Amino acid sequence: MKKLIAIVLTALMLLTFTALAETPVEGMPNPWLDTTAEGLMEALGVEFKVPESAENVVFRMLKDESLAEMDFDLDGMEYTARIQPAVEWTDISGMYYEWENTLEDFTIGSCPAWEGRAADGEATADLCLWFDVAPGLMYSLGTVGEGDLDGFDLTAIAEQVYAPVQGDA
């Protein structure tokens, strides 16, 4: 009798585990929405210029935060550019490093800009931030590359990405 009960309980457990394994697990939904350049303009009223030789260009938005993003590859490196409405200067990059070698007295278009670099010997992260005061838009462009990026000019790529809202800068 004990053997029969053990067999029945084992069979019930197997059925339960099988049912659980076949039930899809609901996770947190991805808040990022893949879109197009036109979709960003329609939904958020912002646009990126795509650098001429860029490949694998992907647009997405975090609509609840009015955050637009463009990922692309250029000359063997991966980049992430972002735009978000803002009333003041803020870091929207999502890159959390101890920035060294910062540069502050320059512009992207006619916008005040900041650039920083962080390196750990194996990889180097570069970030450029700029703020277009008139429309109230904060911009960021970042990349992480292997090794030393000496001589690399992220600001030149930022100029290619920036689409002035007020016309030519």
Residue ranges and their predicted role:
Residues 23-135:
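Short, solvent-exposed recognition patches
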Residues 137-169:
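Surface-exposed amphipathic alpha-helical segments
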Residues 13, 24, 166-169:
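Soluble, non-membrane globular domain cores that form compact, hydrophobic packing
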Residues 13, 129-131, 141-144:
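Short beta-strand element of the conserved SAM-dependent methyltransferase core
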Residues 3-4, 30, 151:
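A generic helix-loop boundary/linker signal
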Residues 1-22:
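Sec-dependent N-terminal signal peptides of Gram-positive bacterial secreted proteins and lipoproteins
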Residues 12, 53-57, 160:
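Generic detector of isolated residues embedded in canonical secondary-structure elements
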